[in-house]
Amino acid sequence: MGWFNGPPSWAEMERVLDSKPRRAGESAAPEPDGPLSRGRATYRPPDEGRAARSSVPYAELHAHSAFSFLDGASTPEEMVEEAARLDLRALALTDHDGLYGAVRFAEAAAELDVRTVFGAELSLGPSARTEAPDPPGPHLLVLARGPEGYRRLSRQLAAAHLAGGEKGKPRYDLDALTEAAGGHWHILTGCRKGHVRQALSDGGPDAAARALADLVDRFGAARVSIELTRHGQPLDDERNAALAALAPRFGVGVVATTGAHFAGPSRRRLAMAMGAIRARESLDSAAGWLAPLGGSHLRSGAEMARLFAWRPQAVTAAAELGEQCAFGLALIAPRLPPFDVPDGHTEDSWLRQLTMTGARDRYGSPEHAPRAYAQIEHELKVIAQLQFPGYFLVVHDIARFCRENNILCQGRGSAANSAVCYALGVTAVDPVANELLFERFLSPARDGPPDIDMDIESDQREKVIQYVYDRYGRDYAAQVANVITYRGKIAVRDMARALGYSQGQQDAWSKQISSWSGPADSPDVEGIPPQVIDLANQVRNLPRHLGIHSGGMVICDRPIADVCPVEWARMENRSVLQWDKDDCAAIGLVKFDLLGLGMLSALHYAIDLVAEHKGIEVDLARLDLSEPAVYEMLARADSVGVFQVESRAQMATLPRLKPRVFYDLVVEVALIRPGPIQGGSVHPYIRRRNGVDPVLYDHPSMEPALRKTLGVPLFQEQLMQLAVDCAGFSAAEADQLRRAMGSKRSTERMRRLRSRFYDGMRALHGAPDEVIDRTYEKLEAFANFGFPESHALSFASLVFYSSWFKLHHPAAFCAALLRAQPMGFYSPQSLVADARRHGVTVHGPDVNASLAHATLENAGTEVRLGLGAVRHIGDDLAEKLVQERKANGPFTSLLDLTARLQLSVQQTEALATAGAFGCFGMSRREALWAAGAAATQRPDRLPGVGSSSHIPALPGMSELELAAADVWATGISPDSYPTQFLRDDLDAMGVVPAARLGSVPDGDRVLIAGAVTHRQRPGTAQGVTFLNLEDETGMVNVLCTPGVWARHRKLANTAPALLVRGQVQNASGAITVVAERLGRITLAVGSRSRDFR
């Protein structure tokens, strides 16, 4: 296994589990099957050596990375690597309006021994950089002179972004910048958008002198330098001479820069293309205004000396200034704010009191649960030793807020290993009963704060986030950023746009990309011009824009902007850091993850619906986790809508695993992640579970840790327990081993711990090296693959709860899932179709019966779709309609409705199409005919001024037309499925319905047909593509080998519905059709798939 290769392939894991040798010619370190879903790996410098010491000292003081978002074409790491190769004395990173790349820049520079200068180019104009091809307004280039200058710059960047009121529009106050500088900044006159160069271009030398005088008055002559650049343009020399001539008059320095926007010359074309994208133009149309970038790459001191031979002192002055401004990003990270505890308490004592109070509720008295209380004492001691009581108090406070506001939440991940978290009500898993290792969560050797993920029902999460802002103050709390990078589809689309291809061509090429990872000969890029592919390849993985992390929040004891600027997110009332979670971790910012979980919302809705319509109060904590009927349902793979086990891969595994007890659900959650199992391979656990393979242990000392998973290591906690049992590690040492073997592997730590493991196993058990080799190899193989058992336990509870509702209250379960959309694996159409197959009647929307969202009728046995699901209506208008009905009674007619609610023609016609006027005794065609006239009748208009309201005799719609209308209006056909209208034709062709495939002998060839609901090609599947087809009787999993997919690629990639001839595989109870040929069927009713998600 290699150090940096990520999780092993399934085939490699099976080989390790079975203690088999590698096959001849097989690499010891196979390439990973797909992209890692882990955090950013530790930066590793390239192998190429550093250039010889340059004879001409030079520092680049004006450089943009890709974190200037479409105005830089190299990563900060690439810029540093090139600076090291060129032997620059220092490198400044001066991205637009932010310090987005500062941490990556600092990490790479530390590895390569490059001195760092931190700065930013401030956009002083009134508009966003992407609002116009060449937005007006000057720029100010600021270099921080040391840590204090950095702090002041960061605070001013944050102030400007927040003052702008919206994302991407910082509003600077030049007077405030002047006051903030305080001698801790150095100002360069900058590029063509700088005050001085802009004045020179617009008004000549006198105007330039006035602009320079203003900068000197504001910041001081010792803190201002004239910047000269030379990009090979005709007027470069004339402009530089005019600028340099101003220096003696004002007593300022002169420095040479390249104004770099990329590391090396090879990225010039990409930089131009990104500039065109920024301006929403093509390269051809942007050519007239796009800034020249021919020479905008890093250069050596010798090359700069040749370019500025007429003024060599400008080159050496740049080196001197760079060395003056350079410093390392050794920021002292803020701590958590002191937690407000009652008088007479410290944070430690208050945490102890809260924990012991909760422990009595969870465990009873200490006499009844001595193990639990001993574990709590141990954990409290470690927490106090590491000075983390405030962290736990903050998390407890968030959980308390959720409970008091009737918001479902639960901690998950490694936090569930903590008895303190369990006692505080943060987690729902008893770590003592489940024998979980606390050190997986927190140990004395840990080099950072613990990581507690809080799952919060998604529809209520915003309340929790705003509570944190209100509780700690917006200056002290912010969300963590998510850097949105270029991937295949958007890379091809944007580069095609930059090269001037039409919108339709951009769409077509983008749609044909599924999982393209770069090769120019991939079938995914067939027919796309080479120049598009070349640029798309170059731009892949570069930042495109800044998003917001799914739930990470940082809380500090001093303004966060002292360390990192904050700006507005797109979402209303959300402020976000300019750094992602990896940057925050590297600097030591304390992060809390408040994650929205749709299933928690669905469960809450289900609880409320069952209570309201059936009078049954459901307490999730009191459900019988051993109920056989729940496990029987899951063993049939009847799990559409069920949390975590509804994917096709999970459904294929459930009949093989045949869950019987709760722990089987824990294993099921861990077995299939992140997606379907690699095509054709079956996990050794299932073979052992079904008695096909014997349960074996390489050494008796492994049995205690692996007994409950039949000798197969699945969980990270088992890896740690094996180190304890086999080699005598302490729990803290075992956690060090787990982390050393993890995604950020350390060669030196691995070497030391490997030696410790071998010595320990020899001393403790006298095991021979052959046995130790096999044991250690298994630990290494599963270090990355292993799932936290605590995480699986937390999720398994939700698997059971959602399964229980599906079994006992299918109508409420369906309505709850519809309310909680968007969530889960299946579309609302598939969820409703599954509910019908379970005997649930579903009614369409009705203006006098529906709520804004889905609800129940007929004593909770039938579902009524919500008005918010109707096209053009939405939740707000739907809620307004419902409130009007409640306040003033049911609507008596279409005209009564439109008189009381001013609906547009479009909205009225959409409701008519959805059948929402059936309560008025109108057919759909009649309602559609009358909708326009009714919508134009207003109290302020004379009667009859609108369209004619006379409704002629109209024929009713056919079932097919009704279904098409339903799907158009709501995306759901409540009482039909598109394939049923073709059933006679399909029967005549010999097509087997999905529900009858179970009776087809294994290996037989069949013809099946259905709407495509999903297309997936997981990275672990060796090129296999999985399709999910659905007809009116059920669903079927279709496996397409790479050869079949290649032969039918265009059809398979785009057809809404398919005819598939293939071979049935159902020997294990999980039905799959291995496709041999694909054909098209045409559905009269629309259907959409969820592809490659």
From Swiss-Prot:
Record keywords, A-Z: Cytoplasm, DNA damage, DNA repair, DNA replication, DNA-directed DNA polymerase, Nucleotidyltransferase, Transferase
Cellular localisation: Cytoplasm
Protein's UniProt keywords contain Cytoplasm: yes
A Pfam short name: DNA_pol3_alpha
Composition bias type Basic and acidic residues, residue spans: 12-25
Catalytic activity field: DNA(n) + a 2'-deoxyribonucleoside 5'-triphosphate = DNA(n+1) + diphosphate
Predominant location category: cytoplasm
Recorded GO MF terms: 3'-5' exonuclease activity; DNA-directed DNA polymerase activity; nucleic acid binding
InterPro entries, alphabetized: DNA_pol3_alpha_NTPase_dom, DNA_pol3_finger, DnaE2, DnaE2/DnaE/PolC, DNAPol_HHH, NA-bd_OB_tRNA, PHP_dom, Pol/His_phosphatase_N
GO biological process, one term: DNA replication
Disulfide bonds: none
Function of the protein: DNA polymerase involved in damage-induced mutagenesis and translesion synthesis (TLS). It is not the major replicative DNA polymerase.
UniProt similarity note: Belongs to the DNA polymerase type-C family. DnaE2 subfamily.
Name listed for the protein in its UniProt record: Error-prone DNA polymerase
Gene field: dnaE2
